[in-house]
Amino acid sequence: MSDVRLIFSVQAVRAFLYGFSSILIGASLAQSGLDETSVGIVFTAMLLGMAISSLAVGRWGEAIGRRRVYGALLVVMGAAGTVFALTGSVPFLVLAALTGTLSTDPNESGPITSVEQAMLASTPPTERSRVYGRYNAVAYLAGAAGALVAGGPAALRELLPALPPDQRWLLVMPFGAAVCAVLASRLSSAVEVDASIAPVERGLRRSRSTVRRLAALFSLDAFAGGFIVQSFIVFWFGRQFGADAALMGLVFFGVGLLQAASSVIAGWLGARIGLLNTMVFSHLPSNVLLALIPLSPTLLVAVALLLARSMLSQMDVPARQAYVAALVDPTERTAAAAYTNAARHVVRPAGPALASVSMGMSAGLPFLVAGGLKVVYDIALYFAFRRVRLGDD
């Protein structure tokens, strides 16, 4: 099996686990009797953990070796999942969350993804955007499947009351992580940076200022995204239109399928019109659709706008990953991916808190703020980087 297929296989298992665990972690925390503050601390620790561990990968990843870091992170993911399966103690949950290897999003963008992005960048430049497109499509499809399967334990418990509680089903995490680690152990040395390059020459050097500018812009996009996290959207649809969890589950399953399809299209599009153009010209109209959602007169119109946005909103993800890889030298790719991903996680926790405040002023204000900030991001990104030549040019 080729290195690309091995990475895709690990991504599929990870995304399934994240889709599965994101539902069960939320359900088990709700059943545990923890107050809202404690639950908020746990989820904030997940985001902070991703930022901290991504920075660590960026700083030391190349020196240690991509395969070693990759395997170690997968083992830690299994250990962290085991903690969530066996205890409800907040200090232990926070420590597990701070590893940065758990995610509430099937398409995680933490330290593991940073290493995968760097390894996939070894593909030829003409194929790179398509590879990243398929890589993200795998995550969306597997994550959607994991979320659907997560409803199984509760349904089966109605027939078999003796089945263990939702929390214990998280023990699937260490088994899945073991499968991932075995697959990762089969990666060849081709995914590593050139061994002839001295360690002191690795990490961010020539592209340091460029990556900092890019990370600052990515953080603006992530901050805006924090206003409209999935849980908030479900809450808003329920408050505005009375949509129940069953309906929204189907809606977000559809969202996952559309995002998978759009990732494949983005890979094809990036090879034809350019990565920066793909990022901006797909993302910009999606943000206009986002701002229109609170103006919808009916549930049907709001769902249609949400689905239409989903077809466009994630097309920038594979293009962004390929763009970062092409923008820097090969020895800088792990650091560049890690630092730009970390920048997104540092600011994202502020979004939900501010969304709750803005919703008190107007129910639809979070959508308008998020859409407006994202439009500013798109325009700023285009004008800041439209004349920057990529390393592969």
Can you say where each PLM-predicted feature lies in the sequence?
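Central cavity-lining transmembrane alpha-helices of secondary-active solute carriers
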Residues: 41-58, 253-265
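Intracellular juxtamembrane helix-capping segments at the cytosolic ends
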Residues: 102-124, 315-328
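Transmembrane alpha-helix termini and helix-breaking/packing motifs in multi-pass membrane transporters
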Residues: 26-27, 31, 143-164, 234-235, ...
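Symmetry-related core transmembrane helices of the 12-TM Major Facilitator Superfamily/SLC fold
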Residues: 167-185, 367-383
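Helix-loop boundary and gating motifs at the non-cytosolic
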Residues: 1-48, 210-218, 222-252
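Helix-to-loop junctions at the C-terminal end of transmembrane segments
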Residues: 53-65, 154, 262-275, 359
